[in-house]
A protein has these predicted regions:
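Short glycine-rich or small-residue beta-strand-to-loop segments that form or flank ligand, phosphate
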Residues: 4-6, 145-147, 241-247, 306-312
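A generic structural signal for alpha-helix starts
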Residues: 154, 251, 316-317
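Alpha-helix N-cap/helix-start and coil->helix boundary motif
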Residues: 40, 124, 212, 315-316
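Alpha-helical scaffold segments in soluble metabolic enzymes
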Residues: 12, 16, 20, 108, ...
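NAD(P)-dependent Rossmann-like dehydrogenase/reductase catalytic/cofactor-binding core
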Residues: 285-333
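N-terminal Rossmann-like NAD(P) cofactor-binding subdomain of oxidoreductases
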Residues: 1-197, 324, 332-333
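C-terminal substrate-binding/catalytic lobe of Rossmann-fold NAD(P)-dependent oxidoreductases
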Residues: 23-86, 168-171, 176-306
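Structured loop/turn residues at secondary-structure junctions
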Residues: 97-98, 151, 207, 248, ...
């Protein structure tokens, strides 16, 4: 039986989660409800026509209270307080507003009768932080409010897991060169982060990220060993992780790349990919992998100082993992 999910917040991630489910053709998950404060027809229009991912691959029909993308009508509401949503029949709520990111805030969803909540962001006090493919096997029926981590943590974690298992990571520092996102302005304006107050499409913008430290929530063996920063750049989608780390023993480019290739062709197939071509960021737009390792960018100095590069579609890869994790949670109900 398909896991019944509802999407709270139909923005970039919410729409792409629905699209990922439809495009994949998977039948183990069914979106039965959407809650968003915008008008139904506006949400449908933004689903039909996407500036980054192109036209929706199916006809989108609407009524005053439903959106239908070919699998039957999806109930659409515009309720501000999640506790008031009529979602007693929902297995997993995908919390995609960016507002209700703590376990405490998500109690409102549980109060309305929903069984589980999956947060599309790092979650404060979540029962568990999951990067699908890396630690989803640690999910239990007692994990009620789960964080899907961030797109960057989803990119870094599979690579870090493979390399730590193969050669050991003593410590490392990550820089994510990250496309601008919806919380950045098109022109200079007020923002609590003065770097992000500047026009997104006009500058490379240094800012913070907790993605590297969050790997410790997913891989306890790396807790405290990784840190990082972000540089937001004037592209609308696709980002890349540049990780420099000290290996626990001497290694080579060939050993690092070989470990990644084996994992990508084995237990991490579909999660971790790799490329041996001279690709640039646009080549990874709409790529469903969490992480695509760039083989010819691997460097090793004096045996232990290592540098790797791994790409990710920060919207599409993450949205596909939201669906994967929701199904894993639903199977435990």
């Amino acid at each position: 039986m398909a896991v019944k999910v509802a999407i709270n917040g139909f923005g970039r991630i919410g729409r792409n989660v629905l699209r990922a489910i439809i495009e994949s053709g998977r039948k183990d998950i069914e979106v039965v409800a959407i809650n968003d404060l915008g008008p139904v027809e506006t949400n449908a229009h933004l689903l039909r026509f996407d500036s980054v991912h192109g036209r929706f691959p199916a006809e989108v029909k609407t009524t005053e209270t439903t959106i239908d993308v070919g699998r039957g009508p999806i109930e659409v509401s515009a309720i501000r307080n999640p506790a008031e949503l009529p979602w007693k029949h929902i297995d997993v709520v995908m919390e995609c507003t960016g507002i209700f990111t703590s376990k405490e805030a998500c109690q409102a969803h549980l109060a309305n009768g929903s069984s589980r909540v999956l947060i599309s962001a790092p979650g404060k006090d979540a029962d568990k932080t999951i990067v699908f493919g890396v630690n989803h096997d640690k999910l239990t029926k007692n994990d009620i409010v789960v964080s899907n981590a961030s797109c960057t943590t989803n990119c870094l974690s599979p690579v870090a897991k493979v390399l730590n298992d193969a050669i050991g990571i003593q410590k490392g520092f990550m820089t994510t060169i990250h496309s601008y996102t919806g919380d950045q302005p098109t022109l200079d304006t007020m923002h609590k982060d003065l770097y992000r107050a500047r026009a997104a499409a006009l500058s490379m913008i240094p800012t913070s990220t907790g993605a590297a430290k969050a790997v410790g929530l997913v891989l306890p063996e790396l807790n405290g060993k990784l840190d990082g920063v972000a540089i937001r750049v004037p592209t609308p989608n696709v980002s890349v992780v540049d990780l420099v780390f000290e290996a626990k023993r001497d290694t080579t480019v060939e050993e690092i790349n070989g470990a990644i290739r084996d994992a990508a062709q084995g237990h991490l197939r579909g999660i971790l990919g790799f490329t041996e071509h001279p690709n640039v960021s646009v080549d990874f737009n709409h790529d469903p992998h969490s992480s695509v390792f760039h083989m010819d960018q691997t460097k090793v100095m004096e045996g232990r100082m290592c540098r790797i590069l791994s790409w990710y579609d920060n919207e599409w890869g993450f949205s596909n993992r939201m669906a994967d994790t929701a199904v894993a949670m639903g199977k435990l109900i």
